[in-house]
């Protein structure tokens, strides 16, 4: 049983009487949503899918925290955006498009990525929710019980609060209607009328009433639990930073129980995701991110979901862009074949089901073949197709075209070790260093290449026989064959290793090979 099934069963045990199980996630449009943020989406999505498989009615919601303040300018956004710090994301203009906000641009980009991943969500836009008045009565509750909330928050602090701090604590921010920033200070609050008197550093001052105000935002540790109650959330996840002993999760759980009279949702924290070969933790605000769009250029959507499905959320892992891409493609392909052949174990069966893979996936060619031979045939797709069809690979499917594009992108962008080409001239230095016996192997190879072979396996078998003699033990034969192949790779590619020789030689012009060896 994998982690998503275990979490789904735990939710049912702890909340057995729910008519609808509301699974929630939230994303800030502070910048491009990266593959680390995607764990915020993938974790509840996989749990929601398991709840459905267990026969439960599920509502999966994605909240865009777009009414949060713009805190700092991401590294990939123009520094002129510093003038917008303190405004809600929906009040900022898009840095790349006209007639839409910063928030809308980032949100739509991410929603398009989710669509490509096949993930459907019910979106909740927090600016709309706050400005519609939907939350006003809950804001009033928080303001009326602000000292109780302060006591809860203060219980998680190590330093004692002063009387002044308690008296001046308000669990809200107010966006100024003039400068649109949250640089406001509350001067007084009347519980009976719900009137709030405030002033802004820009010079504006006013009185608003909570029941009709459209520019109030609850602070995070009150906003989060309030939304749990409003949406009747039964499961949510968040990063390790929120899940610390004195973090926002612990505070919010008490606030939702004691202030809003709602049991907190079942919770699973998640750990960070890195990029293999990269050091720093990804950050939208810093601009150093790998987005789903970037990742989909390398990996099929099913493989991306597989990464998130197979690792427990608490398990930190790296997504590889180096040569391990080949290994992951091979591993996933094997599991899919085992799944459809009904030879897979129960745990991996569940994981493969969670990726949404269909039988059409079996139309995919071997990624390693594509990555290996694309540069060798100088990215000539017609020649590659001719070669692969000899191996009985169907090159006329949608899956083939998509995997070919990913293999080409990966080799050109990340697969430096695979960017090999046939040498233009004979490597005289290597050839002259060979013994007479080793040179005789090359002559036999030339003779073999005079024949016609239907498949690479036929040619591979002939190549293995070149160095085979009766007096060699099995171990000696393996060592000799390895030496023979290294010689061929050095003479053809200038390296000591390379692709499977049978298929490799079928891809090449025979006369050119004979010239080089």
Spans of features found by a protein language model:
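Basic, alpha-helical terminal appendages of large translation-related enzymes
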Residues: 1-18, 33, 59-60, 150, ...
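Catalytic adenosine-cofactor/nucleotide-binding cores of aminoacyl-tRNA synthetases and other
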Residues: 244, 249, 256-259, 271-416, ...
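Charged, often glycine-rich, active-site loop that binds/positions anionic groups
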Residues: 68-84, 138-139, 280-282
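Residue-level signal for inorganic ion chemistry
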Residues: 34, 142, 252, 300, ...
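A glycine-rich helix N-cap at a beta->alpha junction
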Residues: 81-117
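A generic secondary-structure signal for well-formed alpha-helical elements
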Residues: 48-55, 114-121, 146-153, 183, ...
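Active-site cores that bind ATP or allylic diphosphates and position pyrophosphate for catalysis
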Residues: 119-292
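N-terminal catalytic cores of NTP/NDP-binding nucleotidyl/phosphoryl-transfer enzymes
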Residues: 1-78, 225-244
């Amino acid at each position: 049983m994998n982690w998503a099934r275990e979490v789904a069963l735990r939710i049912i045990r702890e909340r057995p009487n729910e008519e609808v199980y509301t699974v929630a996630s939230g994303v800030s449009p502070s910048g491009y949503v990266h593959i680390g943020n995607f764990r915020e989406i993938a974790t509840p999505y996989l749990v929601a899918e398991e709840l459905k498989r267990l026969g439960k009615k599920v509502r999966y919601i994605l909240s865009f925290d777009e009414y949060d303040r713009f805190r700092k300018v991401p590294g990939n956004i123009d520094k002129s955006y510093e003038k917008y710090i303190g405004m809600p994301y929906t009040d900022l203009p898009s840095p790349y498009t006209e007639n839409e906000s910063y928030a809308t641009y980032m949100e739509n980009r991410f929603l398009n990525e989710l669509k490509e991943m096949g993930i459907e969500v019910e979106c909740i836009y927090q600016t709309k929710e706050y400005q519609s008045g939907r939350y006003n009565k809950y804001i009033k509750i928080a303001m009326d019980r602000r000292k109780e909330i302060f006591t809860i928050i203060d219980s998680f602090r190590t330093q004692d609060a002063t009387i002044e701090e308690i008296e001046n604590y308000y669990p809200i921010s107010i966006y100024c209607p003039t400068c649109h920033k949250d640089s406001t200070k509350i001067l007084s609050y009347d519980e009976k009328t719900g009137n709030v008197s405030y002033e802004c550093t820009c010079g504006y001052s006013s009185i608003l009433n909570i029941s009709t105000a459209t520019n109030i935002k609850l602070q995070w540790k009150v906003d989060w639990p309030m939304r749990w109650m409003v949406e009747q959330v039964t499961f949510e996840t968040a990063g390790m930073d929120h899940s610390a002993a004195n973090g926002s999760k612990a505070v919010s759980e008490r606030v939702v129980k004691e202030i809003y009279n709602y049991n907190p949702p079942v919770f699973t924290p998640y750990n960070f995701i890195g990029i293999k070969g990269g050091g720093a933790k990804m950050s939208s605000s810093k601009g150093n991110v790998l987005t789903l769009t970037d990742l989909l250029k390398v990996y099929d959507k099913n493989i991306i979901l597989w990464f998130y499905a197979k690792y427990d959320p608490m398990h930190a892992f790296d997504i590889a862009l180096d040569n391990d891409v080949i290994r992951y493609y091979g591993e996933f392909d094997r599991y899919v074949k085992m799944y459809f052949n009904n030879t897979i174990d129960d745990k991996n069966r569940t994981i493969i089901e969670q990726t949404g893979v269909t039988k059409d996936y079996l139309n995919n060619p071997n990624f390693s073949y594509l990555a290996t031979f694309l540069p060798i045939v100088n990215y000539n797709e017609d020649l590659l197709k001719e070669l692969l069809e000899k191996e009985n690979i169907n090159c006329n499917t949608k899956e083939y075209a998509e995997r070919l594009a990913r293999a080409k992108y990966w080799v050109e962008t990340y697969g430096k070790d695979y960017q090999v080409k046939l040498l233009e001239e004979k490597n005289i230095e290597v050839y002259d260093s060979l013994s007479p016996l080793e040179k005789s192997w090359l002559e036999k190879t030339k003779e073999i290449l005079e024949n016609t072979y239907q498949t690479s396996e036929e040619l591979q078998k002939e190549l293995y026989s070149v160095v085979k003699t009766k007096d060699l033990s099995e171990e000696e034969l393996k060592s000799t064959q390895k030496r023979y192949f290294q010689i061929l790779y050095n003479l053809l590619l200038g390296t000591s290793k390379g692709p499977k020789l049978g298929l490799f030689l079928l891809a090449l012009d025979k006369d050119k090979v004979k010239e080089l060896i």
